[in-house]
Amino acid sequence: MDLLKSPLYSKYVESNAKLVNFAGWEMPISFSGLIKEHESVRSSAGLFDISHMGVISIKGINPKDYIQKLFPTNLYSFSEGQGLYTVMLNDKGGIIDDLIIYDLGIQENDLSELLLIVNASRYEEDFQWIKNNLNMSEISITNFKKDKVLLALQGKNSFDLFEEWIESSISYIPTFGCEYKIFEHISPKEKIFFSKTGYTGENGLEILLSKKAAINLWDFSISKNVTPCGLGARDTLRLEAGMHLYGQDINEETSPYEAGLGWLVHLENNHEFFGRRFLEEQSRLGIQKKLVGLSIEGKAIGRKGCAVLKGEENIGTITSGSWSPTKQQAIAFAYINTTHALINNEVQISIRGKKFKGVITKRAFYKKNY
């Protein structure tokens, strides 16, 4: 089966990017090197093509009413022009996907529209789960992205750069805010969607636009010395920022409480949602494992599947691990037995048959200081 390609694939080739298969897409893992790309985002700005991600449109009269049962988070906690990070759960409280829902307000035919930005590896599962569990006579669900491009402009300079490109201020838009509008000088007939969101721990924007407009933004960014970045730097940046990767840190066997995402579960809202009974029980009785951060001595990297030990006892398993260019140390996430999941608890990590000292930390290793 041929790999899917982004509309900006030719830009990868021009840049001699190193390409890999990611969730059925041929995507750049790096352009100029992971460390350089990572540091560019931390110090100034980087540009990512994230067109592999899925974008689902849900339209209807009050569509939040119909999709609320798919989510443990109160969908009326955000309104038009805002986004909400949440999780979609199965009937046992396991995480089908983590995603962002955006409220676009009233669009065509006086119908309200929601956009769901979902993980590439989960798009088909998400789409079918939504269709199978909703009354499709009341709402419509479509692939919103089609041949559009999804870009992420990330870093402390990203807002200034984007304002220069659109020739307009975005200072009034809050974090997780979004807009869907036409910029006449860029494309007089095309609405561009953008949001103040990202996966790096920095200020950033995620932008959905046509191929022509995307090439315009790409070329503009490169002319301003913005570093094109691949999925490798995206992974190290999100790990430093304490953000989950679906399929590694969360899956259908992990619950929001175990993953440190209990704040997304609004039991007090009293709405019915898939997995509610299971999560009520976890809330009452507690959990057996918990996702934590790990700082590891030396330069050995704890990868997915490495055991975490306390003495001779196996107390957990690493889900994600990398060298942190910012912290200059090996870092990881791991699910640890809750009795041992204490901040500053010293543990050992088994890496290729050798034991390395580690310390349990908060999951976020980096926080921006501006």
Swiss-Prot record:
It comes from the Bacteria. It catalyses: N(6)-[(R)-S(8)-aminomethyldihydrolipoyl]-L-lysyl-[protein] + (6S)-5,6,7,8-tetrahydrofolate = N(6)-[(R)-dihydrolipoyl]-L-lysyl-[protein] + (6R)-5,10-methylene-5,6,7,8-tetrahydrofolate + NH4(+). Its EC number is 2.1.2.10. GO terms for biological process: glycine decarboxylation via glycine cleavage system. It holds the Pfam family GCV_T_C. Belongs to the GcvT family. The glycine cleavage system catalyzes the degradation of glycine. HAMAP family: GcvT (MF_00259). This is Aminomethyltransferase.
